[in-house]
Every structure is written in C-alpha cells, then in structure tokens.
A protein has these predicted regions:
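Exposed acidic/Ser/Thr-rich ligand/metal-binding surfaces
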Residues: 1-208
C-alpha cells in the first residue's frame, strides 16, 4: 500500500544521496529484523545497486517490533572516524515504548537518530523521545507528502552541520543579591546545530 511505497521511495532517495567515502546498511524490522549484510558497506555503485534491489524487495508484514530494529541498528561497533546517522522509517503503531527508549539510551553512544513517521499512525511521543536521546531530528510524512522531497531536505540539513557535540554549561551565575546560585539547563547535551533548525536550550536558577 501507500506506506510501504513511501518507505521504499525514501530509502531509494537516501541510497542515491550517499557520497563517496560513506558507508551504509539497510535493516528491515517488523516481527524481527534482517539486514542487507552483516556490516556497513562502502557506498560504491555496486553496493548501492544491491541495496536498491534489496529495498525494492521489501514488503510489509506482521506487527511493528521496533525494538528489534533499534537493537540491530545500534549493535554495529563504533567507528571513531565516522559520525553514524541512524534513520528509522515506520508507519506502524509501536508499543513497548519504555523498552525501546531504554535500548536507545543504553546503546546509542555517539550515533545520531533521525526517526521518520509515515502517515499519522506512529507514536509521536516515542518518535520525539528517540530524536532527543539520539540528538537528531524527528520528521513526519503525510500521505500527500513527497518522500523524495523530504529526504532531499533531510540530507541537505545533515550534510552541513554548523556545530556538533553541543554542550551547555553555565558557571558563576549570581542572584540579584550577589550570591552564586545553581542552574539547571535542559538539555545538557543538545542535538547538533543544523542550518535552518534552531536549537532551543532552557534554563532555571535556584533564584527563580
């Protein structure tokens, strides 16, 4: 149907947006998870063609067990020479939110997570929290949205981050009486700053 067609269109656009020197992997998840191969592969023309064929062969089946996809996507060893972007595409209602968020929190490491929900069915709270924990950005595609246009915009943003590993720390804040006060900042570890996507930081002091 329309959701799987949108998913395939988004995957095709993402694969064709790979740059020389990139590596990638494609993971399918429903009741279980399966992958294009055991490890990320270089973005060579042959590997991209193989991945496009794999993506075209995918069909929707069963329920949406996102936990299997999360575990599979975050299980690859970290490459200190690369910044890993994990893009999740789903159109299903997703249960076991606490288990999924716990797995993301435990295994995300330095990876960035970008969840994309198709139609109105995905659980927005879960998608939003995954993006926060993964220091990424959440996106939603309606039935009339172009998956190609959405993925083009996504790659345009993430290909040119203005700042990465943004951390906020305030020291020596004084109250009107001159006393040093404590400060709470949220989030302490922010997502990366991308062009056209402002980062919002909030703070609260003991002084109110």
């Amino acid at each position: 149907g329309q959701p799987i067609a949108q998913s395939k269109a988004a995957m095709r656009r993402a694969l064709r947006s790979m740059q020389p020197g990139d590596t990638f992997q494609v993971i399918r998840f429903s009741e279980n998870a399966s992958a294009l191969g055991p490890d990320p592969v270089p973005a060579t023309p042959d590997n991209i063609r193989r991945a496009l064929k794999y993506a075209d062969s995918l069909e929707g089946s069963g329920g949406t067990q996102m936990i299997e996809g999360v575990r599979a996507a975050l299980a690859f060893p970290h490459d200190p020479g690369r910044l890993r972007f994990v893009v999740f595409l789903t159109d299903g209602y997703i249960g076991n939110e606490d288990q999924i968020l716990g797995a993301v929190h435990q295994h995300v490491g330095p990876a960035r997570i970008f969840p994309f929900g198709l139609r109105s069915s995905p659980t927005r709270h879960l998608m939003d929290r995954m993006a926060i924990l993964g220091r990424g950005v959440v996106g939603y595609l309606g039935l009339n949205d172009s998956a190609t246009d959405v993925m083009d915009g996504f790659f345009e943003r993430v290909s040119h981050p203005a700042l990465t590993d943004v951390r906020i720390e305030l020291l020596g804040v004084e109250s009107p009486a001159g006393a040093t006060v404590g400060v709470d900042v949220f989030p302490r570890v922010s997502r990366d700053l991308f062009v056209g996507r402002p980062v919002i930081i909030t703070g609260r002091t003991d002084a109110g």
